[in-house]
Structure formats: C-alpha cells, structure tokens
C-alpha cells in the first residue's frame, strides 16, 4: 500500500456561491488522520468523482438532499483502498466504492461501501459508466423513456458521461439518435466514436433549424439534463406521447434569477396536455436504488462486449478539485471528470 501520509487534506465549503462557484467558495484544510474505531475502516481515496449535482449541495435551498454545511467536507463519490480495518468484512488493500468526499482519508462504518474485487481492471469506471452516471442513463432512458425501434431520441450534453451512455443505449435499442453538444470536436466524437446518427452544435446561430431538419419525424424521447435554449428548440418538435426523462438542469444550476424573455410555462403545459407527454424527473439513488444489480449486470456485459464506449478526463491532484469542478460547470470537460487523488499501489 505504500507509506501512509501523516496528514489528511480536505476541501471544505468556505462560503455559499451566489451564481457560479469561484475558488473562494472552497478552503483547503489539513488535519490528523483519524484512527478507526471498533467496526470501522480507514480509507485512502484514490479517485474522486466530480459531478454537476455537487453545485446543488453547495446551496442551502430545499432540495432532495441536505446541503453541505459551511466548513463541511465537499461531498463526492470515491474509489478508495482500505488502509486499516476493524471491520470483519474488509481487509487492508481492499478496493471499495464509497462517498468519502473531497479528502485524502476517511473513516467509514462500512455500511455505505461496495467492494470492487481484488484487482479491478478500471477502478475509476465505477464512478462513471459502471456507476452513478451510467445508472442514471440506463434507468432514465429504459424505464421512463421506454425506447422503441425506429423512434427518434434527442440527447443533450451528448459527450458527457450520462448523455454519451444514453445515446449508445438508444442505438442498441434501434433508435435514431440525435446528439447535442458544444463544439465541433465533441460532435465528431459523438458520431464517429459513440455512433450517434447526428450531432449538432448548440452554439450554432441556426441551431433550432438544424435540429428540426435532423428530426423530420419529430422527437419521441428527449433526455433532459441541461435545460435552457435547447429545450426551447425541442419543445415544438415533440410527438404525441413523447417521453422526457429529466435527470438534471445544468444550465440553471448557477442561476440567481429567471432567464429573460416571455413566460414559457403556459406553452410547456399546453404541449404536455395536448400531446399527452410524459415529463418525469427522477433522482437515481432514491428512485432506482433497488434496481442497481439489474443495471450492473447488463451494463457490465455491454462494456465487456465493447457495445458501450466510455471516455474519462482524469486530473491529477486533490489540490486541483475546485478549479476542475468550476470548469465542469462551464462545460469544459470532455467525458467523465475524475480527480486522481493518489496512486493505486
């Protein structure tokens, strides 16, 4: 396992952001490494997942999960190794999936840990395609979207960890998949690597016209995780009985007020009514936690058979977590964002 560090670095929430997070909202602290008590394990973080939902946990507005306290460690999924164990089910060296957050070390009771096996080939993938983002894509599309062969599926943030997986599952189910991404490079990746039929740059001046042309038969499923102007362009293209799984609204996470322009709610509600549209939000852990094994079995097989392609963007060093997270919210990432906190020896 290598020599144990003598101090634990941790990023805490220094202040709540007003609008987009800034470096001053975070503070790096150091303290002594805790000693595990009876029935506990000491974990060393190897990989830390950075995800858009963390922005919501920085605010104190009512939500589906409690906010991070001022001075509290920033939340986050992690892949760790057991350093010391007073728990019968865990031994030093074990690989585990957990929620240690933005820090080098953590004490766990073991209740929220999942073993990853003795020698996982790609342990960080448990934070992406084989973890929460992949699970979100899988359940949102298959349970709420219910794709049928020949239908048109539109996926925003097409090269992100959720969108990329949604589109590829859609192709496996026989859909025409239209991706939406920011920039030509991401669009090329969506079509040439991920297998999307079309991918459109939402920065284009004529984006709405391009989308209408790409969906001549309308839109049967719109997988929503961004919101904003993209939804405005999709709305008039929705077919009768269209389905809209909603797993996130990244475009509004930093908003401090409603966007300018006319009230869009009457048009949305009229469209939902007249076209009998299913518009459903979901929180993956709370709504589908009981189906995790179903996902792991099928997604694991797809990945093994190279039917699902996956891209990571790994940044080395816990010290880089805040700036990398800020970039994630600005759409600078290309694939799943992971911080490599320590080596895997």
Predicted feature residues:
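Short glycine-centered segments of the SAM/dcSAM-binding site in methyltransferase folds
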Residues: 95, 152, 176, 242-243, ...
């Amino acid at each position: 396992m290598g020599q144990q560090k003598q101090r634990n670095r941790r990023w805490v929430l220094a202040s709540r952001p007003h609008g987009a997070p800034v470096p001053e909202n975070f503070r790096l602290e150091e303290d002594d490494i805790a000693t595990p008590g009876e029935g506990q394990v000491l974990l060393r973080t190897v990989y830390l997942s950075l995800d858009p939902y963390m922005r919501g946990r920085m605010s104190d507005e009512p939500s589906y999960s409690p906010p991070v306290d001022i001075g509290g460690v920033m939340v986050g999924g992690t892949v760790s190794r057991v350093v010391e164990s007073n728990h019968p089910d865990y031994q030093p060296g074990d690989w585990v999936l957990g929620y240690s957050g933005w820090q080098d070390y953590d004490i766990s009771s073991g209740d929220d840990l999942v073993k990853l096996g003795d020698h996982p080939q790609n342990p960080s993938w448990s934070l992406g395609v084989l973890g929460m983002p992949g699970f979100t894509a899988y359940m949102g599309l298959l349970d709420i979207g219910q794709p049928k062969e020949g239908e048109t599926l539109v996926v925003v943030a097409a090269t992100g960890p959720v969108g990329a997986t949604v589109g590829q599952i859609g192709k496996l189910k026989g859909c025409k998949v239209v991706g939406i991404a920011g920039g030509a490079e991401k669009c090329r990746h969506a079509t040439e690597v991920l297998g999307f039929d079309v991918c459109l740059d939402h920065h284009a001046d004529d984006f709405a016209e391009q989308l209408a042309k790409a969906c001549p038969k309308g839109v049967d499923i719109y997988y929503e995780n961004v919101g904003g102007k993209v939804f405005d362009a999709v709305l008039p293209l929705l077919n009768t009985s269209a389905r809209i799984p909603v797993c996130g609204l990244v475009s509004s996470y930093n908003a401090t007020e409603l966007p300018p322009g006319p009230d869009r709610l009457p048009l949305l509600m009229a469209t939902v009514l007249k076209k009998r549209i299913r518009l459903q939000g979901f929180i993956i852990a709370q709504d589908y936690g009981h189906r995790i094994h179903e996902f792991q079995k099928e997604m694991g097989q797809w990945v093994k058979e190279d039917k699902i392609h996956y891209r990571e963007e790994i940044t080395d060093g816990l010290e880089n977590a805040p700036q990398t997270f800020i970039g994630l919210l600005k759409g600078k990432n290309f694939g799943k964002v992971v911080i490599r906190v320590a080596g895997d020896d």
